[in-house]
C-alpha cells in the first residue's frame, strides 16, 4: 500500500506542467566556526589588584586623596564663607584674620582630612561608594568649582573692598 501511494505521487507529479512545479532551493555550504578558549566557561574572573593601603600612596601627587580632600574642604569652606557673609557681613579675608575663623579652619581641615583618609587606608577605592546621584566624578567637579568659588570670593573682596554679599 505504501508503495502504491509513493508511485501515485510520482505519477501525479509527472503530469503537472513544468512551470507550476516548485523546486527546493539548493543547499549551500554551511560553515562551521570554531573558537578556541584558554579558560573554561566557568573560570573565575582574574583577581583585581587591591588598592594600596599606604599613606604615601594615598597622598601621592596622582593619588586618590589630595584632590578629593582639597575639594571637600573647598566645598565646606565655600558654603560656610557665604553663610557667614550673609549672616554677619564679614568678608572672606576678615573671616580668615579672626582667631575664631582660624580655629574653625584648623579643626575642619583635621576632621575632614582624617575622615577622607580612613576609608582609603582600609583599601576602599574612591569610586567604591558611588550612588545614583553623587558619584566620584561629580564630587571632583564640585570640588573644583568650589575651589574656583573661594578664589572668586577672595578676588571680589580684594578688588571691590567689600564682601561678595553686601548686607
Swiss-Prot record:
Induction trigger: By light.
GO annotation, cellular component aspect: chloroplast membrane
Record field: transmembrane: 101-121, 145-165
Record: transit peptide: 1-33
Pfam families recorded: Chloroa_b-bind
Compartments in which it is found: Plastid, Chloroplast membrane
Entry membrane topology: Multi-pass membrane protein
Keywords: Chloroplast, Membrane, Plastid, Transit peptide, Transmembrane, Transmembrane helix
Domain of life of the source: Eukaryota
Principal subcellular localization: plastid
Family, similarity comment: Belongs to the ELIP/psbS family.
Role this protein plays: Probably involved in the integration of pigments into the mature pigment-protein complexes.
Name assigned to this protein: Low molecular mass early light-inducible protein HV60, chloroplastic
Organism: Hordeum vulgare
Taxonomic path: Eukaryota, Viridiplantae, Streptophyta, Embryophyta, Tracheophyta
Amino acid at each position: 500500500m505504501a508503495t502504491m501511494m509513493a508511485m501515485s505521487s510520482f505519477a501525479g507529479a509527472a503530469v503537472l506542467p513544468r512551470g507550476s512545479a516548485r523546486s527546493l532551493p539548493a543547499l549551500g555550504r554551511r560553515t562551521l566556526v570554531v573558537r578556541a578558549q584558554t579558560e573554561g566557561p566557568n573560570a573565575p574572573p582574574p583577581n583585581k589588584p587591591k588598592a594600596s593601603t599606604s599613606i604615601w600612596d594615598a597622598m601621592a601627587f596622582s593619588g586618590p586623596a589630595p584632590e578629593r580632600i582639597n575639594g571637600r574642604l573647598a566645598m565646606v569652606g565655600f558654603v560656610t564663607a557665604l553663610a557667614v557673609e550673609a549672616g554677619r557681613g564679614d568678608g572672606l579675608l576678615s573671616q580668615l584674620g579672626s582667631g575664631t575663623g582660624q580655629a574653625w579652619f584648623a579643626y575642619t581641615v583635621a576632621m575632614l582630612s582624617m575622615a577622607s583618609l580612613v576609608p582609603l587606608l582600609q583599601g576602599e577605592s574612591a569610586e567604591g561608594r558611588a550612588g545614583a546621584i553623587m558619584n566620584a566624578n561629580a564630587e571632583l567637579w564640585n570640588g573644583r568649582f568650589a575651589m574656583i568659588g573661594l578664589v572668586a570670593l577672595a578676588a571680589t573682596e580684594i578688588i571691590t573692598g567689600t564682601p561678595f554679599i553686601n548686607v
